[in-house]
C-alpha cells in the first residue's frame, strides 16, 4: 500500500440483504456467508480501516450480525488505527497487524477450507514484553500469554486481538 491510501473493501453485505429476495433463487435474502465468514469479513474491514458501510437490511438483521457491526472494540480499531501491515501468509494462515493507541491490533485469518491450528508467535510481530492480550470478538482478556497465542480456526474464520 502506498502512503495516503487504504484498501477500500466497499459495502459489508452481511445478514439479510433485502426484504424480498425471491429473485435470488436458492440464496434468497441471505448473504450466503456463514457466521464465521461474516466475522472474517468484519475483521478484514476493521483492520484495513475500510468504511463500515452496512449493506444488510437493518429491519431483518439478526442479533449475531448486529453484534458484529456494533462491536465497539472492533470499531475502535477501524476508526483509530494506523496503516495496516501484512505480516505473513503461512500454511493457509494470513496475519495482518496495525498500531492503535498503546497496543498492536492483530488479525489472524484462516484462508483454507479446513480447520487450522496456529501458534501466533509475538516475536514475529515485533512484540516483546507482553502485558496483556485481548480477544476483541469475545471482549475478554486471554490469560497467560507471554510469547505466543494459540489459535484454533474453523474454515474461513478469523480471530482479532489487541496486544499490550
Question: Model-predicted segments: where are they?
Answer:
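Catalytic cores of secreted or luminal carbohydrate-active enzymes
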Residues: 40-88
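Generic recognition of flexible, low-complexity loop/linker segments
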Residues: 31-33, 92-97, 148-149
Amino acid at each position: 500500500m502506498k502512503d495516503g491510501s487504504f484498501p477500500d473493501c466497499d459495502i459489508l453485505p452481511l445478514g439479510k440483504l433485502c426484504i424480498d429476495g425471491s429473485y435470488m433463487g436458492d440464496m434468497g435474502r441471505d448473504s450466503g456467508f456463514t457466521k464465521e465468514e461474516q466475522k472474517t469479513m468484519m475483521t478484514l474491514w476493521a483492520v484495513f480501516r475500510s468504511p463500515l458501510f452496512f449493506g444488510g437490511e437493518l429491519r431483518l438483521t439478526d442479533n449475531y450480525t448486529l453484534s458484529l457491526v456494533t462491536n465497539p472494540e472492533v470499531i475502535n480499531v477501524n476508526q483509530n488505527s494506523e496503516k495496516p501491515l501484512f505480516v505473513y501468509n503461512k500454511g493457509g494462515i494470513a496475519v495482518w497487524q496495525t498500531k492503535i493507541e498503546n497496543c498492536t491490533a492483530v488479525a489472524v485469518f484462516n484462508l483454507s477450507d479446513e480447520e487450522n491450528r496456529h501458534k501466533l508467535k509475538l516475536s514475529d510481530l515485533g512484540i516483546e514484553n507482553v502485558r496483556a492480550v485481548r480477544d476483541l470478538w469475545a471482549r475478554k482478556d486471554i490469560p497467560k500469554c507471554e510469547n505466543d497465542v494459540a489459535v484454533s480456526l474453523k474454515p474461513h474464520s478469523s480471530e482479532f486481538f489487541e496486544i499490550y
